[in-house]
Design a protein with these regions (language model features):
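Alpha-helical transmembrane segments and their immediate juxtamembrane boundary regions
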Residues: 6, 10-88, 147-175
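Hydrophobic alpha-helical transmembrane segments and immediately flanking/interface helices
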Residues: 127-153
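Generic alpha-helical secondary structure signal
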Residues: 77, 108, 120, 141, ...
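Generic N-terminal initiation segments characterized by hydrophobic and/or small/turn-forming residues
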Residues: 2, 20, 98-101
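Solvent-exposed, non-transmembrane helices and loops of integral membrane proteins
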Residues: 88-137
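Acidic-enriched, low-complexity/disordered segments with a strong bias for Aspartate over Glutamate
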Residues: 16, 37, 99, 130-131, ...
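Cytosolic juxtamembrane N-terminal segments of multi-pass membrane proteins
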Residues: 1-11, 137-143
Length: 175
C-alpha cells in the first residue's frame, strides 16, 4: 500500500514539475518579448487595425484578442495546478476517513507531539491500512484534477499562443 501511495505522490510531483517548467519557459519568453521592441510592433499592428475600421480588421482584432485571452486562460489553469487544494472535509462525503494519522494537516491538528504519538500507538495495522487506502484515494483524486488542469492549460496556452503569433505575422505583413 505504501508503494502505491508513493507512486501516486510521484505522479503529483511529476505534474507539478512539468507545470513549473512550462510556466518558467512562458515567463522567460514573455520577458524576452517585453524587453525587446516587439511590444511596440504589436502596438503598431493593433493601432493600424483599429484605425482601419473594416470587417477584416475587426475580425483580425477579435481573433487576436480571443487568442491572447485563450493564452492567458491557459496560463491561469497551469498556475491553478500548483495550488494545493486538499480539504479533508470534501472527501468525508465519499466515505474517506477524516481524522488521518498520515495526512499532514490532520497530524498538525494534534495539540502536542505526545497526543499524536499516543494516537499512533493505539492504531492497529488494519486501521493504518485503511488510512493509507484513504490517502491513496484522496491523492488519486488530487492527481487526476492536476493532470486535467495541466492538459487543458497546456492546450489553451499552445492554441492561444500559436494563433496569436499567426495573427501578429499576418498583421506585420499587412502593415
Amino acid at each position: 500500500l505504501s508503494e502505491t501511495l508513493n507512486r501516486v505522490n510521484s505522479w503529483i510531483e511529476n505534474c507539478d514539475s512539468k507545470v513549473s517548467t512550462i510556466l518558467s519557459g512562458i515567463g522567460v519568453f514573455a520577458g524576452i518579448l517585453l524587453a525587446t521592441d516587439y511590444v511596440s510592433k504589436f502596438t503598431a499592428i493593433f493601432r493600424y487595425m483599429c484605425e482601419k475600421k473594416t470587417v477584416s480588421s475587426t475580425i483580425f482584432l477579435i481573433i487576436s484578442f480571443l487568442s491572447f485571452g485563450l493564452l492567458l486562460y491557459g496560463v491561469f489553469l497551469l498556475i491553478r495546478v500548483l495550488f494545493a487544494r486538499v480539504n479533508p472535509k470534501e472527501f468525508e462525503g465519499r466515505g474517506v476517513k477524516g481524522d488521518s494519522l498520515i495526512f499532514f494537516s490532520s497530524i498538525a491538528k494534534n495539540k502536542t507531539f505526545s497526543k499524536y504519538r499516543g494516537k499512533l500507538r493505539k492504531c492497529s495495522s488494519e486501521q493504518m491500512n485503511d488510512d493509507i487506502i484513504s490517502q491513496i484515494y484522496i491523492c488519486s483524486l488530487v492527481c487526476d484534477k492536476k493532470f486535467s488542469l495541466y492538459k487543458k492549460g497546456l492546450i489553451c496556452s499552445l492554441v492561444g499562443f500559436i494563433v496569436f503569433i499567426i495573427m501578429a505575422i499576418i498583421g506585420a505583413v499587412l502593415i
